[in-house]
């Protein structure tokens, strides 16, 4: 069974997110710092009748990077062509995409950190000077062809900005760090989703659901759907704070937004390693999860909420982690 708090896409969620997707910056809830900067850059580019500078959006999964890319294209009034790093396997795949762009278009590459180096190198001249040089043929009969491209905007999205090469990162003129959502913003998102799907929800229930959604809209919308099921079967169809708490408790989502995997990580650190420090590889083996999964999916939220600290010697469980799980804490 999939983890209810997984911030990667599940099942029909891509369709759901498209339904919920705002069209313009004024409709986009949260990420105010990124929005305010983009508003200025977009308006300036439109006034000069130029393509917007290339944009890099980075941050944990589920925070709206793809949505922001679509909003940028809508604000510019241009087409958006979407692909992802793993899909572009060779330089020829990228050349075909670039050759299909119209002036001012947005090319959105999700998981851009997963582009093969041979593909990435083609992007350098395309991003900087809007041209590519491609080789036609093989052996002695091969020749180089210079292909001019129309001005375009590349929007790259990544959950692992540190994996981008320096030459690629340097070619993005605009960077936006997508952060976990504030409680008030996430509450508003829950209420907006409920309204779109004609669910009856109290403000208190929306607030509680937002509190336990790890600052992530994708998780909040997923939990809202599950709580609605509980409200229909165990209540009168109205999503109130009582049914919300009962549903989320049954789903093993506690009041800090931690599920059984998060708690397993913390309990392992406390019970087996006296709170740490413990290496990420060792910890991953003990909880039977891939190292990358722990690092990308679980650890960022646990650090952001103050349950774990990173040190040079490894990960350390904080006093807050001990208190949350009911362990006695003593200074080392």
From Swiss-Prot:
<dbReference type="GO" id="GO:0006281">
    <property type="term" value="P:DNA repair"/>
</dbReference>
<feature type="binding site">
    <location>
        <position position="312"/>
    </location>
    <ligand>
        <name>DNA</name>
    </ligand>
</feature>
<dbReference type="InterPro" id="IPR036390">
    <property type="entry name" value="WH_DNA-bd_sf"/>
</dbReference>
<feature type="binding site">
    <location>
        <position position="291"/>
    </location>
    <ligand>
        <name>DNA</name>
    </ligand>
</feature>
<comment type="subunit">
    <text>Homohexamer. Forms an RuvA(8)-RuvB(12)-Holliday junction (HJ) complex. HJ DNA is sandwiched between 2 RuvA tetramers; dsDNA enters through RuvA and exits via RuvB. An RuvB hexamer assembles on each DNA strand where it exits the tetramer. Each RuvB hexamer is contacted by two RuvA subunits (via domain III) on 2 adjacent RuvB subunits; this complex drives branch migration. In the full resolvosome a probable DNA-RuvA(4)-RuvB(12)-RuvC(2) complex forms which resolves the HJ.</text>
</comment>
<protein>
    <recommendedName>
        <fullName>Holliday junction branch migration complex subunit RuvB</fullName>
        <ecNumber>3.6.4.-</ecNumber>
    </recommendedName>
</protein>
<keyword id="KW-0067">ATP-binding</keyword>
<dbReference type="InterPro" id="IPR041445">
    <property type="entry name" value="AAA_lid_4"/>
</dbReference>
<dbReference type="GO" id="GO:0006310">
    <property type="term" value="P:DNA recombination"/>
</dbReference>
<keyword id="KW-0234">DNA repair</keyword>
<feature type="binding site">
    <location>
        <position position="181"/>
    </location>
    <ligand>
        <name>ATP</name>
    </ligand>
</feature>
<dbReference type="InterPro" id="IPR004605">
    <property type="entry name" value="DNA_helicase_Holl-junc_RuvB"/>
</dbReference>
<feature type="binding site">
    <location>
        <position position="65"/>
    </location>
    <ligand>
        <name>ATP</name>
    </ligand>
</feature>
<feature type="binding site">
    <location>
        <begin position="128"/>
        <end position="130"/>
    </location>
    <ligand>
        <name>ATP</name>
    </ligand>
</feature>
<dbReference type="InterPro" id="IPR008824">
    <property type="entry name" value="RuvB-like_N"/>
</dbReference>
<dbReference type="Pfam" id="PF05496">
    <property type="entry name" value="RuvB_N"/>
</dbReference>
<keyword id="KW-0378">Hydrolase</keyword>
<dbReference type="GO" id="GO:0009378">
    <property type="term" value="F:four-way junction helicase activity"/>
</dbReference>
<keyword id="KW-0963">Cytoplasm</keyword>
<feature type="binding site">
    <location>
        <position position="315"/>
    </location>
    <ligand>
        <name>DNA</name>
    </ligand>
</feature>
<feature type="binding site">
    <location>
        <position position="21"/>
    </location>
    <ligand>
        <name>ATP</name>
    </ligand>
</feature>
<feature type="binding site">
    <location>
        <position position="67"/>
    </location>
    <ligand>
        <name>ATP</name>
    </ligand>
</feature>
<keyword id="KW-0233">DNA recombination</keyword>
<feature type="binding site">
    <location>
        <position position="20"/>
    </location>
    <ligand>
        <name>ATP</name>
    </ligand>
</feature>
<dbReference type="Pfam" id="PF17864">
    <property type="entry name" value="AAA_lid_4"/>
</dbReference>
<comment type="function">
    <text>The RuvA-RuvB-RuvC complex processes Holliday junction (HJ) DNA during genetic recombination and DNA repair, while the RuvA-RuvB complex plays an important role in the rescue of blocked DNA replication forks via replication fork reversal (RFR). RuvA specifically binds to HJ cruciform DNA, conferring on it an open structure. The RuvB hexamer acts as an ATP-dependent pump, pulling dsDNA into and through the RuvAB complex. RuvB forms 2 homohexamers on either side of HJ DNA bound by 1 or 2 RuvA tetramers; 4 subunits per hexamer contact DNA at a time.</text>
</comment>
<keyword id="KW-0227">DNA damage</keyword>
<dbReference type="GO" id="GO:0048476">
    <property type="term" value="C:Holliday junction resolvase complex"/>
</dbReference>
<feature type="region of interest" description="Large ATPase domain (RuvB-L)">
    <location>
        <begin position="1"/>
        <end position="181"/>
    </location>
</feature>
<dbReference type="GO" id="GO:0000400">
    <property type="term" value="F:four-way junction DNA binding"/>
</dbReference>
<dbReference type="GO" id="GO:0016887">
    <property type="term" value="F:ATP hydrolysis activity"/>
</dbReference>
<feature type="binding site">
    <location>
        <position position="218"/>
    </location>
    <ligand>
        <name>ATP</name>
    </ligand>
</feature>
<comment type="similarity">
    <text>Belongs to the RuvB family.</text>
</comment>
<feature type="binding site">
    <location>
        <position position="66"/>
    </location>
    <ligand>
        <name>ATP</name>
    </ligand>
</feature>
<feature type="region of interest" description="Head domain (RuvB-H)">
    <location>
        <begin position="255"/>
        <end position="332"/>
    </location>
</feature>
<dbReference type="GO" id="GO:0005737">
    <property type="term" value="C:cytoplasm"/>
</dbReference>
<keyword id="KW-0547">Nucleotide-binding</keyword>
<dbReference type="InterPro" id="IPR036388">
    <property type="entry name" value="WH-like_DNA-bd_sf"/>
</dbReference>
<feature type="binding site">
    <location>
        <position position="66"/>
    </location>
    <ligand>
        <name>Mg(2+)</name>
    </ligand>
</feature>
<feature type="binding site">
    <location>
        <position position="310"/>
    </location>
    <ligand>
        <name>DNA</name>
    </ligand>
</feature>
<dbReference type="InterPro" id="IPR003593">
    <property type="entry name" value="AAA+_ATPase"/>
</dbReference>
<dbReference type="InterPro" id="IPR008823">
    <property type="entry name" value="RuvB_C"/>
</dbReference>
């Amino acid at each position: 069974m999939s983890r209810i708090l997984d911030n990667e896409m599940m099942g029909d969620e891509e369709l759901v997110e498209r339904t919920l997707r705002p069209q313009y910056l004024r409709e986009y809830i949260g990420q105010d710092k990124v929005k305010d900067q983009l508003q200025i850059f977009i308006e300036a580019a439109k006034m000069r009748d130029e393509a917007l500078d290339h944009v890099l959006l980075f941050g944990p999964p589920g925070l709206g990077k793809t949505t922001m890319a679509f909003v940028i294209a809508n604000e510019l009034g241009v087409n958006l062509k979407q692909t992802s790093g793993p899909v572009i396997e060779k330089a020829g795949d990228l050349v075909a995409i670039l050759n299909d762009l119209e002036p001012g278009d947005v090319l959105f590459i999700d998981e851009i950190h997963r582009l093969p180096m041979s593909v990435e190198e083609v992007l350098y001249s395309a991003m900087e000077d809007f041209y590519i040089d491609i080789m036609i043929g093989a052996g002695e009969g091969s020749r180089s062809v210079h292909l001019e491209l129309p001005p375009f905007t590349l929007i790259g999205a990544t959950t692992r900005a540190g994996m981008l090469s320096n030459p690629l990162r340097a070619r993005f003129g605009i960077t936006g760090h997508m952060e976990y959502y504030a409680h008030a913003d996430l509450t508003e998102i829950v209420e907006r989703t409920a309204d779109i799907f004609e669910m009856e929800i109290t403000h208190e229930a929306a607030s509680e659901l937002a509190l336990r959604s790890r600052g992530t809209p994708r998780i909040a919308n997923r939990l809202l759907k599950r709580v609605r099921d509980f409200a229909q079967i165990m209540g009168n169809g109205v999503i109130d704070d009582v049914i919300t708490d009962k549903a989320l408790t049954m789903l093993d989502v506690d009041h800090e937004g931690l599920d059984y995997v998060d708690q397993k990580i913390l309990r392992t650190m406390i019970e087996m390693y006296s709170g740490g420090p413990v290496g990420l590889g060792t910890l991953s083996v003990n909880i039977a999860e891939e190292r990358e999964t722990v690092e990308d999916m679980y650890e960022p939220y646990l650090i952001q909420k103050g349950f774990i600290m990173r040190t040079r010697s490894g990960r350390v469980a904080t006093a807050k982690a001990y208190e949350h799980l009911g362990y006695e804490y003593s200074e080392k």
